Amino acid sequence: MKVHFVTHGCKANQYDTEKFRQELEARGATPVDDPLEADAAVVNTCTVTNNADRQARKAIRKLKRDNPDLEIIVAGCSAALRFDEYQGMEQVSGVVEGHDAVQVAGLIAPEAPLLDRDEEPIGGELLERNVRGTRGWMKIQDGCDRRCSFCATKVARGASRSRSEDEIVDEARRLADAHSEIVFTGIHIGHYGHDLDGGKHEHSLSRLIARLLEEVPDVRFRLGSIEAT
């Protein structure tokens, strides 16, 4: 099974696509850059604007037009908010409401074994590597507690949820074996840790950075999306 990946939107979505890729590779799938060579495609959508939704639908139609035999799976933020709309598109084979890599892979390779994974609130296994470039993406947080009237991210991604420090450090060590720079991703990483320890605020972004600099010293760390995006 050859799978092509299309990612729209933010760095957090890029990280989620890497999760999809890793899960499918574990099930025997082969990622391909050319959609004409693919048996299936995963479109990871964005919904930050109406134009983002239109671009996702346009991409889906083009994929199917260029490769009529392609099985198309739609996931991501737009899919979370517009499940029925994508489900109703004749070009679409399946829809996942959000970013669950197991669900995405299950629609393409349902009979293959799953990866072992931790039960983390943002639902992600550890990435071993990112497939492109010297930078590795590492999501430390997902969701947002803000209620901005112009933004659908809160609805699409849910409340702010932080990964544990131990898991982040473990993933950073793995990524450091293949990358010289690691980029923190999330929706509002400045809010990291506020939901841990029952809201006692014993965890924070600054504390996490200090620990990473001490325990994973041979890699650069870059911050993105400190405020809600």
Mark where each language-model region is:
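Conserved radical SAM core fold
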Residues: H188-G193, V219-R220, A228-T229
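Proteins enriched for Cys/Gly/acidic motifs involved in redox and nucleic-acid/cofactor modification
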Residues: M1-G193, S204
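Alpha-helix-loop-beta-strand connector modules within alpha/beta enzyme cores
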Residues: G199-R220
